């Protein structure tokens, strides 16, 4: 899709209007609390019997979560790297074994993005991480673990499954600059449209909301 065609499909994302709505959402929330902001999308034109499900990891321009929920599952070679870079990690050897099952389950529950060093399969199966709705990154030779960690902060999962009628993704939180939230929305919607078989023709409605507020219609 050309850049012009993409811009035409997302013309409803006028910056002035959307940033104004974001500001109103933020003002309606308790300033002492940080609340997640997400986009909800109603879809049309899909046949659940024929169309393929969509599961994508989207990397947005700005951090989407207020708290670090990224963890390195570290082998011996990467423990020192994590310590030097002040990255949260758990050593594989320290949480392996039947007697550490509760610790492993707690780590899995508390974190969203997992950086998996070689040997991670001693404690976690990839399919179980995915089944829990988490986002894994298997560290390859040459990967910069700091860069991967920063990417994790900006990543969110997009799923279009089951009846294909609705999907959603996180775009930020009420502690962020409204302009940054807007940029995350714009990039996220651009990626979503690129994954849809008929582009913006598959969009039925687009809304923005916080964890606590009713949705506000954008499209």
Curated annotation (Swiss-Prot):
GO CC annotation: cytoplasm; large ribosomal subunit
Pfam families on file: Ribosomal_L1
Keywords: Cytoplasm, Ribonucleoprotein, Ribosomal protein
Biological processes, Gene Ontology terms: translation
Stored SUPFAM superfamilies: Ribosomal protein L1
Protein's cellular compartments: Cytoplasm
UniProt keyword Lipid biosynthesis, yes or no: no
UniProt GO MF annotations: RNA binding; structural constituent of ribosome
Glycoprotein in keyword set: no
Quaternary structure (record): Component of the large ribosomal subunit.
Family: Belongs to the universal ribosomal protein uL1 family.
Name assigned to this protein: Large ribosomal subunit protein uL1
